[in-house]
From Swiss-Prot:
InterPro entries: ATP-grasp, ATP_grasp_subdomain_1, IMP_biosynth_PurP, IMP_biosynth_PurP_C, IMP_biosynth_PurP_N, PreATP-grasp_dom_sf
Domain ATP-grasp: start-end pairs: 113-328
Reaction equations catalysed: 5-amino-1-(5-phospho-beta-D-ribosyl)imidazole-4-carboxamide + formate + ATP = 5-formamido-1-(5-phospho-D-ribosyl)imidazole-4-carboxamide + ADP + phosphate
Enzyme category, top tier: ligase
Protein name: 5-formaminoimidazole-4-carboxamide-1-(beta)-D-ribofuranosyl 5'-monophosphate synthetase
Purpose: Catalyzes the ATP- and formate-dependent formylation of 5-aminoimidazole-4-carboxamide-1-beta-d-ribofuranosyl 5'-monophosphate (AICAR) to 5-formaminoimidazole-4-carboxamide-1-beta-d-ribofuranosyl 5'-monophosphate (FAICAR) in the absence of folates.
Taxonomic lineage: Archaea, Thermoproteota, Thermoprotei, Thermoproteales, Thermoproteaceae
Gene name as annotated: purP
Keywords: ATP-binding, Ligase, Magnesium, Manganese, Metal-binding, Nucleotide-binding, Purine biosynthesis
Native organism: Pyrobaculum aerophilum (strain ATCC 51768 / DSM 7523 / JCM 9630 / CIP 104966 / NBRC 100827 / IM2)
UniProt EC number: 6.3.4.23
Amino acid sequence: MALKPTMSQLLKNYDLERLAISTVASHTALQILRGAKKYGFRTIAVARGEAVAQFYRQFPFIDEVWVGDFANFRKTAEKLAANNAVFIPHGSYVEYVGWRQALEAPVPTLGCRELLRWEADQFKKMSLLEKAGIPIPRIYKTAEEVEGPVIVKLFGAKGGRGYFVARDRRELAERLKRVTEDYIIQEYLFGVPAYYHYFSSPVYSRLEIFGADIRYESNVDGRTFGWAEPTFVVVGNLPMVLRESLLPTIYTYGVQFLKAVEEAVGCKLAGPFCLESIIKDDMSIVVFEFSGRIVAGTNIYMGYGSPYSVLYFDKPMDMGERIAHEIKEAVKRGKIEHLFT
């Protein structure tokens, strides 16, 4: 990766005793910054406008709240680097600044930054899952190929906005006439949606299953009484504890995904990521999406910890705390460059 030497050199100039953790004031910022403060780091939130900034200023664990320039995020990133800050990406960051700016932002960024480019393209995302040997839904290139119910998804981190389902090729062809953005057509899967939270740890040289959630989507999960068109805009998340017999498969998929990222994308993924799936009634798991960074579903155990974190640390820990723990231990062990790109 072209960016890695630059970020590596930048980190060498950091005062690691005064490290700050920063993120965009949205999505999982409260969880991330609360965890960072609990582990003794300075904290910075970058807000999209003064009204948002005012909300985040009420929290004592956030040391500084800035109003950022998201149209030209490079300036904000340079200011973060000048303040000895590392950056934690999440879905709102990707949506606000776009993957191109995110790739070029001159601030050490947790995880595999190049993976953001792949996340922006639904076809590349599915090809990566396929390379990992993970079961995926059938993908259709045109409406004429469709043989049953499908779901149409727009590119990018949009929280389900603009997604729709169609029962057959005729309905699909009609509805696609109104779509003006890039999209992918996937086989519609029947079963239970489940979103798996993982943490890839360079410090401990292991992959951790950290939690799971179900998304609550409007208005497919709302009170529509059959009067409204199903939509998939995410409004919140519900906790989920998985059948223990499913965990080995879920863990294996995570391992396979990490290997595929390293081989295809060219960098090792450190920190949180998510595989998004349907569990069918025969207990098979089909993965239809991934997020190569922290997901909002981890907010379900903010403050009291993931039910799976006790398996690794013998104490409850939420994902914000887990990120901070990894960074603190990486500083102690001289492995900080393994976390950031």
